A protein has these predicted regions:
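Secretory/extracellular carbohydrate-interaction modules
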Residues: 1-105, 120
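Short, surface-exposed loop/turn motifs at beta-strand boundaries within globular domains
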Residues: 13-17, 118, 126-128, 143
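Short, intrinsically disordered, charge-balanced linker/junction segments flanking boundaries
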Residues: 197-199
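Short loop/turn segments at secondary-structure transitions that flank enzyme active sites
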Residues: 26, 81-85, 139, 156, ...
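Flexible glycan-contacting loops in extracellular carbohydrate-active proteins
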Residues: 163, 167-193
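Short acidic (Asp/Glu) patches
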Residues: 109-120
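N-terminal secretory-pathway/extracellular module detecting exported/lumenal segments
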Residues: 95, 156, 161-169
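Carbohydrate-binding surfaces in secreted/extracellular proteins
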Residues: 125-162
């Protein structure tokens, strides 16, 4: 159960950075403030394969902030696997690889809503305070592939923090088209709690 909205960005618009400011005055446990649910431009792969897709048509990844059931507050960034089919019908699966942080105890592959990789990092975001999430694409110095970094800026302290970064396994990738954001309750026992989010 969640409430969602879309940033109306034309489908052919490509961009390398994505910034959202948000505040959650009420964020009980079981709250997910998803600030980006986006599509990546994989035209580099589309020139090499007959078919390129992710588990959900038009959605490549998502990121935001959660308040877990035990009260722990975290950031999350996820990328779905990319399935590339060649002319012979052979399928190559490309999974993003985390390059920062070097290790966390909550970094893992995911399944259930498709398959892919996500990084969950402790970040003590507080109710009633403004934050900015900043996603940006760059180029890996070691692989030449596109890197996507997730940053957070705390307006109260003036501090910017790099939360995580992924090597997408493919060069020349950027964001494309509209992006969704949503406020979700992901724990049924807490579904009656009031939650808010402004973006």
């Amino acid at each position: 159960p969640y409430i969602a909205g879309w940033l109306s960005i034309p489908g052919d618009t490509r961009y390398t950075e994505y910034v959202v400011e948000f505040i959650a005055d009420l964020r009980p446990d079981g709250t997910y403030c998803c600030l980006g649910n986006w599509q990546m431009d994989y035209s580099y792969l589309e020139r090499q394969y007959t078919s390129v897709r992710t588990e959900y048509s038009g959605v490549s990844g998502y990121a935001g902030f959660q308040s877990l059931g035990d009260g722990t507050r975290v950031s999350i960034m996820s990328f779905w696997d990319v399935y590339c089919t060649d002319a012979d019908g052979s399928v190559t699966t490309i999974r993003a690889q985390r390059v920062y942080p070097e290790a966390t105890d909550r970094t893992e592959d995911f399944s259930g809503e498709g398959t892919g990789a996500h990084c969950i990092v402790p970040y003590n975001w507080k109710a009633g305070y403004w934050y900015q999430m900043h996603l940006k694409c760059g180029v890996s110095q070691s692989t030449g592939n596109t890197i996507v970094e997730q940053w957070v800026y705390d307006y109260a302290t003036g501090e910017s923090t790099l939360l995580c970064a992924y090597d997408l396994g493919v060069p020349n990738v950027c964001f494309k088209g509209a992006s969704a954001f949503f406020l979700e309750n992901f724990l049924e026992p807490l579904s009656g709690e009031v939650r808010t989010m402004e973006v």
